[in-house]
Structures are given as structure tokens and as C-alpha cells.
Amino acid sequence: MKKRPAQHIIPGMPPGIIIPSDSAQHPRGVDLLTYSADAVDERPGLAVDDALAAIRAVTQAPATPPQVLWLNVSGLADAQLLKKIGEALTLHPLAMEDVVSLRQRPRVDNYDSHLYIPLKILQQDDNALTFNQLSIFLLNNLVVTFQEQTGDVLDAVRLRIRHGSG
């Protein structure tokens, strides 16, 4: 297994500050998946402002049948992007700090407006096992995922949603 680099902790910084690790990968945009019992709409590689505008439009005018939105970010190096998403969706600052802190243990944190679930994903790359962090936020009709690496570990979930079995 590959060993992770040490996490940078800056003494005196207030809690909730987003500081990506040196090994973090830059996101390639965000992916937005909107689905209901009847339809699936995928928009990969969106600018964050476009994705947040689409989320606001759906949440302000609920559709029939109800829709679920899934915002996915792969790569955690862009602190401003992460901060913008966290503030726009009112995600707890300590949970957003934990998104970039790659030594989180799996757990469920219950905040007023959402749940935060950090998980470890085991992957095999070039005969080596690696652990990658997957952070999940569950809100009302909205799922937000942050993947440590730009490779997508959630393709199987998307496939099930596309075929109506997810």
C-alpha cells in the first residue's frame, strides 16, 4: 500500500479553513446528475456557477415527480471551488475542512441541514492498493460527493441510475 503524505496543520488557524494537501488533484469541473423515477439528465464538466444555478432552480421550483440532484467533484486541490460549494449549499465549515483532511475515519456526522459521511475507497492501481477518500453530503433531494482522486469510483452507481435500478 502507498503511504499518504503528512497532513499540513498550521498552528493558530481557526477551525473550518479549507487547506488542500500537497498531493491533491485539481478538479476537472463538476458533474451534475438530475434524476427521477422517469428521467435522467447528466451534465458532466460544468462550471461550478452553472451547477449551483441549476441546483437553485430545481430546489426553488420542485418538480413532479420529485427529482434528486447529485453534484460530484473529483479532485480536491481547488480551495476556492470547495469553499464556494460549501457556502452556496450551507455545508458545515468543519465538515468542509474534513473533506480535504484525507485522514478521516469513516463515520456519520449529523448537522442541522445535512449529513456528512467520509468513507475510504480501496482501489487497485498497477498492482498496488490505495485508499482514497470519498466525502458524501446528504441534503433534502441533493447528494454532494467529493472524491480525492480525479478517477471516478462512482461509475457503477451512475450506471444503476441510468438503467432505473439505482
Residue positions per predicted region:
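Peripheral, non-transmembrane regulatory/ligand-interaction domains of membrane transport proteins
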Residues: 1-166
